Amino acid sequence: MKEYKNLQCDVLVLGGGIGGLTAATEIKEVNPDVDVLVLEKNFAGYAGKANRGGGVLQYFDLNRVDPELFVGFHTHEIGGLFTDQPLMKKYVSMSGEMLEKLDGWGVVMPRAEDGGYRIIPTGPFTAMICIDLDITLKVRRRAEKLGVRFMDKTVFSDLLTEGNTVTGAVAFSVLDGEYSVIAAKKVILATGSQNYRVGSMWSNGRGDGYIAAFRAGAELRNTEFGNFAQLVRIRSHNEVVFGENYMYNAKGEHITKNFCQHRETDISSKAIREWYIQNTTGNGPVHLDFGDEPQVNLELLWDRPYGKKFRVLNDETGATVDTDLEVCPMLIGEQSPMKVDREYRATLDGLYAIGDCSYCGSGLAGAVPAPPGRNRGSGILNAVFAGLVAARNAAACDYSGEFKPLCAKQIENAIARVEAPLAKENGIKPEAVIEVIQHAMAPVEQSVVMHADRIAKAMELVQKAKTMLPDMKAEDYHEAMECLEAEAIVTSAELHYLASDMRKESRGWFLREDYPNMDNNEWFKWIDAKYVDGKIELCTEELPTDDWFITKEELITGLVPVTEEEKQTELYKKYYLREMTKPNPMKFMHVGEPKDGTKAQHPYDLNKLFDEGYMDMEIGFAQLPDGGATLANITEMPGVTPEMFDFWFAWHGLEDLRYKVWDREDHYFARTRNRDKALDKSLSMKERYWDTIHDVDENCGLGKEHIQINFRNPADIGFDPEKLKDFKGTIVCSGNEHSPCIMCHFLRPVEGGCELRTRFWFGYSIIGGKPVKVLPDGVEFPLIPVQALLAHNIKEFANLAAILPSIYEEYHADFE
């Protein structure tokens, strides 16, 4: 057996990207007496993905964003109901602390004139901050000052264990082949995800770290959720972030409409499937058409000198070959399956796994691959978050005891495994094995848009690659490292397809064409993997939902919860259990894209609603010319009278169930703060809800959120009192000087009932009895929540139109 150096440290950090550097630095800040060693196959500070990507950090304004509301949004819109709610809440809650930590470590983040961060809104809850690509160098410098030790150009091949406890690792130098056996009391795995070496930006994600842990006995979880793909320009392979919103086929048809009802947070597997369908049905190629919409150039917003040369060179090179905007999907991968708890402890004692090693394995984000994971800017912050959490747990441990003895047989086997391809006189290059796996994984119809037949085809290639592994030959220790990576890439692909074949449903990003629906009865569970006697074994695990604030029952049924007391009522039996009336599906065509804002009604023109006929935009949503936003919906309400409508808004805020039966999938409660007024029979029905406030919990399309609705007399928000005197309908409206939203439900009689014309205006308040724009000049109100609210409004009022006449008949007499 080859000779080796014996080394010791309290904490061994495997991987010198942003996650590993964060963990090492934080441990030394919390407990300076802990001896920390970082081992990196490249150079720590230049390794990982944080210094070669877009350089963006996710940002949450915690003065505006309730972490639980974001968790609800993420659970439904991104995570396929599998989001670990308490862990995600912790991530969001720590966002400000993480930014301050990076700032304190010397990472330069752009500031606005007022001293706050310069941000770009990216969704209803999130924004992003751009940073320069020297982030990892800055953190390494801080770690060095604190006394963290580094071993660069050193590959770890195997973990050492005693029973179920990690005791250290075996490593070798890629420069001269010198072996090191490192005893450690704690080990933090921060070696990244598996990216199958398809896309150059992510090619350093080789999966060898977590596969080594897997072979040592660590369990994995959610290996099927590691198949992210991104649209790229077909010649340069440059990413086109958010390009899925602008997809057109060869016939000039806007095919985004085929899979997306409203603009989503990021690309989904449905976009990949649409590309595949268009090309297999003769409608390809697919190209992008941005129309007149300006494209954001982050380099124009912030000067990032360190990464600027790279970005300019990359863009200039791409421009020489990208003669048009034809796109195709490119597999990114991002398998990140180390099974960990909420302190990022793996199933082997003494082992932590952070960042892209354990993103899916932690359950944090649910059924979605590692960052970008349909959540732009979360990659770096996820690594920082996991690094901080694991580091604080590790720093609090007792390091006073002796090191555990290392197993000589394990050391011998580890060195022999590295040396085996070096000893061969003849053989194949590891690239030959990797290429076979790329043929199995890179075609998105096999790895992303999955079907049993295509999974079987891909598995044949995986098995072929598996048989090639013993024939690999290495000329030097660089190639010996590559042989380890080839073994890992084969195992990663096998894990992906075994678990994908096992999961008979579609969920979140995960898509099975032969099982297109989410199956919460059979598959509300994780798939775990164990390595037993040299073979992969899969089993299922129930999700631990006891401390989730959105309950499992609520997630599975898709209905808001009801109490046992509510279940005894006639209102529950007759209206909650009743299937909701579905709106005309043609109405949802108006939810896909914004309308022309110059033709939409402005809040300053409230009184035009009294005019006969219809306006240019009676249904749809739009950006108004001054930056505000609006939505309009029109609902036919046969058999409904203005008296019924007024009754409903005075009556439903008195009991939670009354709001639930309006929309049992999205309405949790509406509670009036003015019960005495609502019950005062000396007042007219309108007066019983005018100048009252309802506290509302509701899912308006982006997850559960809390809303305050201040109902007003229409004359107090700008409607003409003279016109109101002659109006035969009713107007239910809200708005005040505190809220940047004005709501108006304008109900007018028509033959056979009434017609409801709804308007919402965003970026405006009621000040001095009239609408006033409060949105800063030059700022546009984001359209994603407006778009989502339109879809919700269409849904809820279709059902109210169906149930209101009978509810009024049964309940109004006792209320009046």
Briefly describe each language-model feature range.
Residues V560-D626, P749-E816:
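Terminal "cap-and-tail" regions of soluble proteins that handle hydrophobic small molecules
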Residues N42-E68, S200, N227-L231, N238, ...:
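Conserved N-terminal glycine-rich FAD pyrophosphate-binding loop of Rossmann-like flavoproteins
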Residues N6-C9, D176-K186, A346-L348:
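Core beta-strand elements of the Rossmann-like FAD/NAD(P) dinucleotide-binding domain
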Residues G96, D103-S157, E224-R374, A442-P561:
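Mobile, glycine/GP-rich and aromatic-enriched active-site lid/loop segments adjacent to catalytic centers
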Residues C397-H478:
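Long, amphipathic alpha-helical stalk/connector segments used for oligomerization, subunit docking
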Residues M589-D680:
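Hydrophobic ligand-binding cavity/cleft-lining segments
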Residues K186-N238, S362-N393:
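Glycine-rich loop(s) and the adjacent beta-strand/alpha-helix scaffold that form part
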Residues V11-V38:
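N-terminal Rossmann-like FAD-binding beta1-loop-alpha1 element of flavoenzymes
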